[in-house]
Swiss-Prot record:
Residues 439-452 have a biased composition (Basic and acidic residues). It comes from the Eukaryota. The keyword Transport does not apply. The keyword Nucleotide-binding does not apply. This is Golgin subfamily A member 6-like protein 10. Keywords: Coiled coil. Residues 1-11 have a biased composition (Pro residues). Pfam families: GOLGA2L5.
Length: 522
């Protein structure tokens, strides 16, 4: 019996283990996504509650700007939302990659199984053929071993036939052996392919592990972001202290503004000097234009003279035609014509040169004017921008002074015992005026710069204008209420009514102050 060839190992077990590992990895990713699907960290709700606290709970010793804290915390919330969106996109990419890899693996396994089946069937068929050939050879050997009776030589003997059959069978065996070797090599190639696929699956599993590690790192980053949010809350408190320092710096900026105003005055003087220079240049241009006109008139006179000379030449030619009999006169005529042509050429060249020179001078003057105009426009634009900046800074400083003076007046009035309805009425009117000014500033903040300057001018007190009764008057000592002529110091209302009106005025003034601080921060 012929020895059977060794078959490659069956890849069913390895495929099952690979599919099980892929399913486990998918389950882990789904569980991770379900855990992280809400997308809101635990500390966010707590921080929103902290930010939602009313601004009226501030102490009397200092004021807190809720706009700053809200902007800082919500800014970090947006950053956390962006990280969660990145995680979602990465998870979707991983899911797509897993689906594509699983589909590719399933296709490869199906192809491998089909190839293994076909190879097994072919091997069985070839083994069956080899067995048949072996049996036939065994029979032939037995027949050749038995003694045969001599027969008459009627044709080819049986021994020769058997030898031919054996030779034919040997050739078939050799061909079958070659086919078996080729199949063995194919099986080896298939085994190599299976090994490579297993290595790829292992690499994919390693990638999945790396992605899980990245997800864990992202979780740690989210925790770090929460810690950063807490640090930002502490920074907000520090910013409040910095705002106080900025108020001191504003005083220094006022001095700088005065210096800038002096510089602007100098710039205006320079602009006036430039205007005078431009006027002088315009006068020069007018003079140059007059010169050009005079030169054109001269050229016209020269052209008229040339025409007269041509007429004279024509007359001379006629005379020469009459005197054609004389040979010497013909030579003279030719020489005269040559001289006249030379004079004409020289005059034309001189005219062309003068025209080109005049055109070059005009172009140079025009370019100089254009460059000077551009310089003047740039200078004017820069001066206008500086003036607008100075106006905005002055407007902001006046508003800050108003707020500071209002705070000082409120603290002084809360410290002193009050009795009377007149002071409360003045406080309410002052707070209403401040709220109106803040609203006007909010409206004019998104408008154009000229409108902003008009609103700032409207906010300023106009000298000589009538002041409403019960309004606040700004003086050296601070804000003082104007006396109401109708009440004349009479105490109206009880202590409870006065206390309620005072609290309402404080709340309204704090709201106006918070709005103003938000505007300055923006």
């Amino acid at each position: 019996m012929w020895p059977q060839p060794r078959l490659p190992p069956h890849p069913a077990m390895s495929e099952k283990t690979q599919q099980g590992k892929l399913a486990a990895a998918k389950k882990k990713l789904k569980a991770y996504w379900q855990r992280k699907s809400p997308g809101i960290p635990a500390g966010a709700n707590r921080k929103k509650k902290v930010n939602g606290s009313s601004p009226d709970t501030a102490t009397s010793g200092g004021y807190h700007s809720p706009g700053d804290s809200a902007t800082g915390i919500y800014g970090e919330g947006r950053a956390s939302s962006t990280t969660l969106q990145d995680l979602e996109s990465q998870y979707q990419e991983l899911a797509v990659a897993l689906d594509s890899s699983s589909a590719i693996i399933s296709q490869l396994t199906e192809n491998i199984n089909s190839l293994v089946r076909t190879s097994k069937e072919e091997k069985k068929h070839e083994i069956h053929l080899v067995q048949k050939l072996g049996r036939s050879l065994f029979k032939l050997k037995n027949q050749t071993a038995e003694p045969l009776a001599p027969e008459p030589p009627a044709g080819p003997s049986k021994v020769e036939q058997l030898q031919d059959e054996t030779n034919h069978l040997r050739k078939e065996l050799e061909s079958v052996g070659r086919q078996l070797q080729a199949e063995v090599e194919n099986n080896q190639m298939l085994s190599l392919l299976n090994r490579r696929q297993e290595e790829r699956l292992r690499e994919q599993e390693e990638r999945l592990h790396e992605q899980e590690e990245r997800l864990h790192e992202q979780e740690e980053r989210l925790c770090e972001q929460e810690e950063r949010l807490r640090e930002q809350e502490e920074r907000l408190c520090e910013q409040e202290e910095r705002l106080r320092e900025q108020e001191e710096r504003l005083c220094e900026q006022e001095e700088r503004l005065r210096e800038q105003e002096e510089r602007l005055c100098e710039q205006e003087e320079r602009l006036r000097e430039q205007e005078e220079r431009l006027r002088e240049q315009e006068e020069r241009l007018c003079e140059q234009e007059e010169r050009l006109c005079e030169q054109e008139e001269r050229l016209r006179e020269q052209e008229e003279r040339l025409c007269e000379q041509e007429e004279r030449l024509c007359e001379q030619e006629e005379r020469l035609c009459e005197q054609e009999k004389l040979p010497g006169q013909e030579r003279l005529l030719e020489e005269v014509e040559k001289l006249l042509e030379q004079e004409r050429r020289q005059e034309e060249q001189e005219r062309l040169l003068e025209r080109e020179r005049l055109l070059d001078e005009v172009e140079e003057l025009l370019e100089q004017e254009r460059l000077r105009q551009q310089d003047e426009r740039l200078w004017q634009q820069e001066t206008l921008r500086e003036l607008e900046r100075l106006r905005e800074l002055e407007r902001l400083r006046e508003l800050e002074r108003m707020l500071e003076l209002g705070w000082e007046a409120l603290y002084e009035q809360r410290a002193e015992p009050r009795s009377g309805f007149e002071e409360l009425n003045n406080e309410n009117k002052s707070t209403l005026q401040l709220e109106q000014q803040v609203k006007e500033l909010e409206k004019s903040g998104g408008a154009e710069e000229p409108r902003g300057s008009e609103s700032a001018a409207a906010a300023r007190p106009v000298p000589g204008a009538p002041v409403p009764q019960g309004a606040w008057m700004c003086g050296q000592a601070g804000w003082t209420p104007q006396e109401h002529p109708g009440l004349s110091g009479e105490a109206v209302g009880t202590g409870e009514a006065a206390g309620g009106a005072e609290e309402a005025a404080c709340h309204s003034f704090r709201a106006a102050e918070n709005r103003e601080l938000n505007i300055t921060i923006i």
